[in-house]
Regions:
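Non-catalytic interaction-recognition regions
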Residues: 2-115, 123, 129-604
Length: 604
């Protein structure tokens, strides 16, 4: 990396300009108070922001309005006083500062500032990456599908959301760990084993002899796994299970042995399938964390003991250990409730952590798991991506972190709304191939992975998605990812064409980008300036979808620029500046697509 390129490492021009504006206005206020123009007072809280209309400046501030009560003067008088005491802007990024309307202060950025944006985006191939997060350790846990069956459309959305969120956090300077929590213990595994065992017995004795209970998993995948196990093991488990009524069978040692054998066979296969499909979806986890290890290591018991010691739990008459959930959850929102004994009203509900039979609940393991993240492994933040149907669990989980001596604010939950698959404008429920509910496997066989990852990240987590299967397979501008990829390929084509005509790009350090003043050029430059801060905002708001929308707008702005500003045949100095602008846009599109693990074609 050259010294010139190092100048633009971790470069965030928009934030730098906002910070400089705040510093100038703060200095002006202090100077005005020092000479008595404004009365001495604590500086009011004020805003510096990017106005919607560039006619109102590149940056605007409400400091005069915010200070009206503090300084007991009209906002216009305050604004004029601040302007009179403003430090020289000669060596700043600003070319002009003015008062507008009732007292807004508008600041205009210099052409040399905008030129620096072009050069930074052109010279720094990782333009957009900043050190905003200062290396803070963040854990992002997402998908974490039960290994008892195939992944569904919610997992497809959660995979794209969690992976793209991890990417914007990484690009914002956080030390990110991507994690999958494998629910390989508890009731769902018992249910999985029971479902497999009944299907296995049906294979040899028929469905009438061993009807599948309603609470068992009904999917065809259970039959397939049980059939595979039968092919490997034959009927050696059947005889020991015969001659018992249903209740006796399900409590018998023979049935328990059959369940254990089936789970030992089927669970690793399902986990391997999860890993295979998520790998195909381009998700690479740093940690696969097994719930079972929390039980085997004694971590669940240790957490329950700690909560008892802290008075957050108590023992009920039947021996169950109860957690005082409402006491801690109320701070964070919804408190789970139950009916009073007479059924007339609702009261706060305490939660069972350990049942009367001594078996811990899923909630106890969940507390132990998050304690492991925040205390044992020392993450500054644990971010969980959950389906919106789990909203009732958020407050009690955050409250549990407080109860155990941690900070519930260090656990953040991103709630994700539903996905509706659409074809020909109609909802699609079943796979044409299997006749069953559409799985992630089915989706990735029909839809290009680039489209799936981009389209599932087009909306913020709180919005539902109608995923259009017809749109996802299109190879034209109706498909947003194609539109963005085409903009990149078009720039590559322009650069190659110029080279073929003997026009070589001289390098960013030799370009005079102050020559770029056309409206379409300035639109592009303003977008380039915003890019690093857009990534930071996406990270802070846990909303990577804003980057998808940004890059679509950038592609549109580039097409407008190319339609109105000639590169071929332009004045040589202007031509070099426009090539630098093209390369800057190309770098940003490349960085967005690679950040989100989407292919970046150079020709289409």
């Amino acid at each position: 990396m050259t010294d010139f390129e190092k100048t633009y490492q971790n470069y965030n021009p928009r934030q730098a300009a906002l910070d400089e504006a705040r510093a100038l206005l703060t200095a002006a206020a202090k100077a005005a108070m020092a000479d008595g123009t404004l009365p001495e007072a604590e500086l009011p809280a004020f805003i510096v922001e990017i106005p919607a209309d560039v006619k109102n400046g590149d940056i605007a501030s409400n400091i005069a309005m915010a200070g009206a009560r503090t300084w007991r003067k009209a906002p216009k008088m305050i604004a004029d006083a601040l302007l009179a005491h403003l430090p020289s802007i000669e060596n700043s990024v600003f070319s002009k500062v003015e008062v507008a309307g009732p007292g807004f202060i508008n600041l205009f950025l210099s052409q040399s500032f905008w030129a620096g944006v072009v050069l930074g985006a052109c010279a720094n191939k990782e333009y957009g990456r900043t050190d905003h997060g200062k290396g803070a350790k963040y854990n992002v846990e997402f998908v974490s599908a039960n290994p008892t069956g195939p992944m569904h459309m919610g997992n497809a959305r959660g995979g794209a959301l969690g992976d793209c969120l991890s990417a914007v956090l990484d690009w914002s300077g956080y030390d990110v760990t991507r994690e999958f929590y494998i629910n390989d213990a508890g009731n769902q595994i018992q249910k999985f084993g029971k479902s497999l065992a009944v299907r296995y017995l049906q294979k040899y004795c028929g469905e009438e002899a061993y009807p599948l209970p309603a609470e068992c998993y009904q999917g065809g995948d259970i039959k397939v796994l049980a059939g595979e196990f039968a092919e490997l093991n034959g009927d050696k488990y059947v005889a020991a299970c015969k001659g018992m009524d249903e209740e006796t069978l399900f409590e018998s040692e023979a049935f328990a042995a059959l369940k254990d054998a089936l789970v030992a066979y089927a669970l690793p296969k399902n986990i391997a399938a999860l890993k295979r499909d998520l790998g195909k979806y381009r998700i690479d986890y740093d940690v696969w964390f097994h719930e079972s290890t929390l039980h085997e290591s004694g971590a669940v018991k240790a957490v329950v003991d700690k909560l008892l010691e802290l008075g957050a739990c108590y023992k009920a008459e039947d021996g169950a250990i109860m957690y005082r959930s409402a006491q801690y959850a109320a701070k964070y929102g919804t408190v789970n409730k139950k009916k009073t004994e007479d059924g007339t009203e609702e009261e706060a509900k305490d939660e069972v952590l350990v049942r009367a039979n001594g078996i811990p609940t899923y909630f106890a393991a969940d507390i132990a798991y998050h304690y492991n993240k925040l205390a044992t492994r020392g993450f500054a933040k644990a971010i969980d991506v959950w389906g919106a149907d789990h909203h009732g669990h958020v407050a009690r989980m955050k409250g549990a972190m407080d109860a155990i001596g941690l900070n519930g604010e260090d656990l953040d939950v991103v709630l994700m709304q539903m996905v509706n698959l659409m074809r020909d404008g109609q909802p699609v429920r079943m796979s044409k191939r299997t006749g069953n509910a559409i799985t992630l496997t089915d989706l990735l066989e029909e839809v290009p992975i680039d489209s799936a990852r981009f389209l599932f990240n087009m909306h913020d987590a709180g919005s539902g998605i109608d995923f259009d299967l017809d749109q996802a397979v299109k190879t034209d501008n109706d498909n947003p990812v194609y539109y963005v990829q085409y903009a990149h390929a078009r720039i590559c084509s322009i650069l190659k064409k110029m080279e073929s005509e003997g026009v070589q790009f001289a390098g960013a350090e030799k370009v005079d980008a102050t020559l770029l003043t056309e409206p379409s050029e300035m639109d592009l430059i303003r977008m380039l300036a915003a890019f690093p801060q857009e990534i930071v905002m996406a990270a802070e708001k846990y909303d990577p979808s804003r980057i998808n929308r940004f890059v679509i707008d950038l592609a549109s702005a580039f097409h407008r620029f190319y339609g109105s500003c000639r590169i071929q045949g332009a004045d040589p100095a202007v031509q070099q500046a426009r090539l630098a602008l093209c390369i800057g846009v190309k770098n940003v599109i490349f960085n967005v697509l690679t950040m989100f693990k989407i292919n970046v074609p150079e020709k289409m």
